[in-house]
Amino acid sequence: MAIKFQYNKTSLGDLGKQLKMRQKALPTIKSKESALRSEVKKAKDSAGDYRRRLDRLKAEYDYMVSLWGEFDCDLLRIADVELSVQKIAGVRTPVLQDVKFEVKPYDLFSSPVWFADGVDILKRMAQLGIEFEVYNRKMELLDYARRKTTQKVNLYEKVQIPGYEDAIRKIKRFMEDEENPVSYTHLTLPTILLV
C-alpha cells in the first residue's frame, strides 16, 4: 500500500500523527488477538466436548432404535431457547441460558412404559445438541474476529508502520536538501578538476 504524501511540513506532521497512532494501537490489537485466540480454543474445546457427550448419549441408547419407531414424535417439542449475549474481547457471542420443552400429555397406562424415559432421553439429547450449536456458533464468531484482528496486526506491522516511517524519512531528506543546497560556486576550476 503506497502512502500518499507531499513534501512539506504539514504532511510530515500528519504522517507523524498517523504513525504514532498506529504504534500506540498495535500492542492493544495484539493483546486482543491473543485473547481471541485463547477464547477460540476454549470454545472449540467446549463444542468438541458437547459433541462427544452427544455421541456417547446416542451410543448409550442405540439398543432402543427398534423401539423409537413406536414413539410419538409429537410428545416433545422445544418451546423456547433462551440466549443471552456476552462480550468477549469486544465480540458479541451467544450464551445459552435455558431450553424450555413442551411435553404433550399422554396416557401412562395405554402408552409403552419406556415413553417417560424416552422423553427424558430426547430432552437431554436436544439440550446437548443445542449447547453444541451455541458453542459452535460462538467459536465461529470468535474465529472470524480473530482472523480480522490478525489481518489488522499484519497490516500495521508489515505495511502501514514501515510505509509511514519510509515516507517520513523521504520528507525529512527532501527538507534537509532544500535547507542545505549544495553550492559549487565557491569552488575554483583547479579544485573541481582535482576532485
Named regions from a protein language model:
Residues 185-191:
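Conserved small/polar residues in nucleotide/adenosyl-binding loops
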Residues 181-183:
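Acidic, proline/serine/threonine- and glycine-rich low-complexity intrinsically disordered segments
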Residues 51-101:
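Long, charged all-alpha helical bundle/coiled-coil segments in cytosolic proteins
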Residues 12-29, 33-36, 40-57, 61, ...:
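Amphipathic alpha-helical coiled-coil segments
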